[in-house]
Amino acid sequence: MHPFTKTLVTTALPYANGPVHLGHLAGVYLPADLYVRYMRLKGEDIIHIGGSDEHGVPITITAEREGISPKDVVDRYHRMNSEAFSKCGISFDYYGRTTSEVHHKTAQEFFTDIEEKGIFIRKSEKLFFDRKADRFLSDRYVTGTCPICNNTEANGDQCEQCGTHLSPLELINPKSKLSDATPELRETMHWYFPLGRFQDQLESYVHQHEDDWRQNVLNYTHTWLKQGLKDRAITRDLSWGIKVPLESEEAEGKVLYVWFDAVLGYISFTREWAEKLGQSERWKEYWQNPECRLLHFIGKDNVVFHTLMLPAILMAWNEGRQSECYNLADNVPASEFMNFEGRKFSKSRNYAVYLGEFLEKFPADTLRYSIAMNYPENKDTDFSWQDFQNRTNGELADTLGNFIKRSVDFTNARFDGEVPWDYSEDLLNNVLLCDQIDDIARAYDGFHFREAVSSSMDIARNANRFLTQNEPWKLIKTDPDAAARVMSISLNLCHALSILFYPVIPETCNRIHAMLGFDGTIDSLIKPGVSLWEQAKKPGLNKGHRLLGKSEILFTKIEDADIAPELKKIELLVAEAEKREAGAEQQKMEFKPLISFDDFLKVDLRVARVITAEKVKKAAKLLKLQLQVGSATKQVLAGIAKYYTPEEMVGKNVVIVANLADRTIRDDVSEGMILAVEGADGKLFVIEPEGEEINGRQIQ
């Protein structure tokens, strides 16, 4: 393992087009903060960089819908989200904005450098243009009918009904969202980044991390590499964004694509952090220093941007340089998703718990603990109000909080608020089990945050059990020295727990620190080169040390009445969702206009057998099927990849519309359509005829 001396942690930039919700917190920001706080406890040199992604089409759409400027939109949500993160204890060293002057300059420097090296490719292409609005239309400004499922409200980038990723040119009857007019095709030129040029380098880079990156990260990355990396546009025809830094007619009205500019925010924000410290060159110690470890904390939907695209951009910059070369990420700990009460978080349906609103009602530390214990490391997890209540009451209040308060209160009452006994480190280890602390450290080091926090709570349970079983309130009457030994151990366990739990419930641990009679906070003791973590293994409170003299209830229990309004909200949201689903189902049940018997006879339905099946590149929902229809073969592109693997389809009997006119989809020809039925949950089930010697036979 590389002996790194510094660590730079970045977190995915939340889009400044809405408030962050608990799903965002669980997948990205809390795990990053747990790791950063743990590393600070160890005395490591680490910085945590984040910020707002403030460019892109959704922001302009929101601004136009509300009749305000894009700047007004991003100002609102940057402030809202940064305040929510701060209130939740997410300890950024710097939280920037991609609308800043430094960021614009940084992104333009990268563009200029790569352009001057001749790496970019210029391509002319035809895009939709709205004559009424006098502007080119990006994919999200175009709507129309999906060619796969015939949804009449598909967007230009994706059909929400069937999930197929689309381009605006694939839509049937496209219309502009700006004017409702039918757009026309016009030629425009854009700059493209040739990802394929760096495929070999990227494959070598990824191969170096086969043993230490998470499987989901490797799976997403390998899928893209196997398909072959393609050129990717890095400019758009928009007014909101970072201007292409060229004085030419071609660059007029063009900005950098947000995927290119946003990932460079990590660099520009680190620059701003250094400038804020008055050490403008210090950022290079973290970006251009091989001794610094770079970690990107993200959700699984962001993987390839951090394992392929950003590394490729940095490779392009490094090309031909002997100095000022950028580090590539050493690890990309991407999380799975956290759902909410059994359903996916959805801003569009308002099915979410927003972080700022949550913290107006409940303490941050209770949320941090609950989410850490449900951290979606290897699979999707679920946040529920009942689980939140149970963990707060049963684990934080009844276990950790109860032990701390009992220990402090008994010492204040029976030993005049002083630690009553000196003892050896071995005595503490017999109770605390330092091996457990080492196991917790290994869990944090390996990004296994749920394991780390769960093991910390196990120590709290053992401590609580130790106090209860030894009954110092009885011993004090018969053997005061024995009671003194028990309380000295208990108080030192309180001290150890204040350190072990600091990454997850920092505000509470600072309060425990004060109750134990220490000046300042744990935060104030943190400094590079000093390991507070190791101090958790040693007696921190010697005989005669005075406690604060008073205690407090660390966690207020959550009553049923406290979460009743939240459960009611869920009922209403679920009812609305079910109503929409029922309405959609009812709409589907409406029969189509009558046709004549002769028209029906024109449809040639036949039994076919699937010979081969494969996924379609850049179309996550499509399978390409080769079908044997009697003595003939046909190729069909079917939108079933979400529900069937290629291997599952091979050998199946299916029903094909054999005389359907050919249709071009994704530059490939589909010579028919297979029949499937949609279940109540939206899942598609392919119709499979049974019987022998029926291949090629007509359905009657």
Swiss-Prot record:
Q: Where is the tRNA-binding domain?
A: 599-700
Mind telling me which GO cellular component terms the entry cites?
Answer: cytosol
Highest rank taxon of the organism:
Bacteria
Give the cofactor note: Binds 1 zinc ion per subunit.
Into which EC class is this enzyme placed? ligase
Q: Which residues bind Zn(2+)?
A: C146, C149, C159, C162
Q: Does the keyword Chloroplast apply?
A: no
Its keywords, alphabetically, are: Aminoacyl-tRNA synthetase, ATP-binding, Cytoplasm, Ligase, Metal-binding, Nucleotide-binding, Protein biosynthesis, RNA-binding, tRNA-binding, Zinc
Q: Where does the record locate the signal sequence feature?
A: none
> Where does this protein hold ATP?
K347
- Residues annotated as coiled-coil are none
What reactions does this protein catalyze? tRNA(Met) + L-methionine + ATP = L-methionyl-tRNA(Met) + AMP + diphosphate
- Describe the task this protein carries out: Is required not only for elongation of protein synthesis but also for the initiation of all mRNA translation through initiator tRNA(fMet) aminoacylation.
Q: What is this protein called?
A: Methionine--tRNA ligase
Record organism: Pelodictyon phaeoclathratiforme (strain DSM 5477 / BU-1)
UniProt gene name: metG
